[in-house]
Every structure is written in C-alpha cells, then in structure tokens.
Amino acid sequence: MKNVYFLSDAHLGSRAIEHGRTQERRLVNFLDSIKHKDSAVYLLGDMFDFWYEFRLVVPKGYTRFLGKLSELTDMGVEVHFFTGNHDIWCGDYLSKECGVIIHREALTTEIYGKEFYLAHGDGLGDPDKKFKLLRWMFHSTTLQTLFSAIHPRWSVELGLTWAKHSREKRVDGKEPDYMGENKEHLVL
C-alpha cells in the first residue's frame, strides 16, 4: 500500500524565521526518511517564502530541498507541487529539473477510495476585496512581464521583503491561536 504525505507552508528562505537553514534540513531529513517507501508527496503550496522564475534565473538557495525533490522523483516517488501565494510564479524549472508535477489549480483526486480536494487554500472563499485585487495583480501576466524586467538582484529582494512584512503583520492586532515554534499554524 502506497504511503501518501501532505506538506505545506514551509516558507523556505523566509527572513522572518530565525533558523531557516535548520528548517530546510529538518524538512529534507523528513523527505529522506520516506524515500525508500512506495509513496507520494503532495506539497500544498508556500514551500518557498518567495519563488519567482525568470527566463534564465531561479532564486538562490534551497539547494538541499531541490536536490531531495530530484532524488525522490528519480527514485519513482510521485511529488506533486501546488502553487501557493508565495510561490505562484513557478515556471517549468521544478518540473523539468526536479521532476515534480506542478498544479496551479485545485485538484480533486481519489486516494484509497476516498475523494480529496487538494489546494493551497489561498483565496478559497475569501471575500476581502483588497486581497482579491492583490491576488489578481499577482496572477496578471502583464504585471509578471513587467516584474521580470527588473533585475533579479532587486526584484528578489523586493519579494523577500514583501513576504517578511506579510508574515509579520498581525491579524486584528492579535496572534492567531495554535502557533508552532516557527509561528506557523498547526493543524492536527
């Protein structure tokens, strides 16, 4: 029987997380622990805190994680990557170089006779008009083309700073409940 794993919101590379390299190593160690099993992995968005692929450039870093994804797919492990609001700008690098299956939309699939609706969750049913406008802007091919014209030295810096600011913002002036050691929501 195939083992199926669901992971999301690692936010690798985040400047708001104190020990980012340690976090990446822990994630890679977990993925390493499942590599010999008949398994499938669903990465449900925001695995990176900011990911933007330029035509010939991808963000610096994430070497251990990208290498482990490549190793898993080379061994026949099915790895599904759903884009989230921090990594919506995936081109074809992850699929061509690492062998992952990219999903830009929600997926309904059957696993062990049960139907699953898989998505990052960003914007699902969110009525906030400002958020919808921002989401539209991030998905606009015209704005992506303009952003691509900015040298990666500045655009990646802008993206990482924006992501850090977004993470540090408080919801209604309070910290949300059920936060883990890296200030991530815990869902049990």
Specify the residue positions occupied by each region the protein language model found.
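Charge-rich, low-complexity amphipathic helices
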Residues: N29, D49, L56, S70, ...
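Context-gated lysine
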Residues: K2, K35-K37, K60, K68, ...
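Short hydrophobic-aromatic micro-motifs
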Residues: F6, E115-A119, D126
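Core catalytic region of metal-dependent phosphoesterases/phosphodiesterases
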Residues: K2-N3, L7, L12-I111
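Active-site-proximal loop/helix segment associated with metal-binding centers of metalloenzymes
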Residues: G121-K183
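Acidic, His- and aromatic-enriched active-site or binding-groove loops in soluble protein domains
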Residues: E110-I111, F116, T142
